């Protein structure tokens, strides 16, 4: 039997063209997204879709119907669009886009493992924390 073990709760981050007005902000608030076009990748394994996470912001959501790739980053860089992603993936996008954090909850990050392996995972996490 497999079980899901949550490791942390993540937040949304947004990739933006460094010249855009939003790029001057330190952190994106939900009200900053009103009438702003937000590009959303499709990831079947996510707890909730980006559209669901941002549904109350008034953003103009554009579902890309695929996972992000270079084309989606270029689209955000050269158009007035934001690219939304989990903040833990910031390093994947920061070389092309200015990345802005938010307090918008993106859901949990965790692992799927065999039931009964929780102690082994705890030991692994402790070793990683010591190394960092």
PLM-predicted stretches and their roles:
Residues 1-5, 10, 71-119:
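Beta-alpha-beta core module
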Residues 18, 31-34, 105-132:
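Extended ligand-binding regions for polar small-molecule ligands
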Residues 2-12, 16-38, 122:
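Flexible hinge/capping segments at coil-to-helix
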Residues 8, 34, 55, 74-78, ...:
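Alpha-helix boundary recognition
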Residues 4, 30, 50-54, 72-74, ...:
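Short amphipathic alpha-helical segments and helix-helix/interface helices
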Residues 40-41, 59-70:
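Short beta-strand-to-loop elements that line the ligand-binding cleft
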Residues 36-58, 121:
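Secondary-structure junction motif
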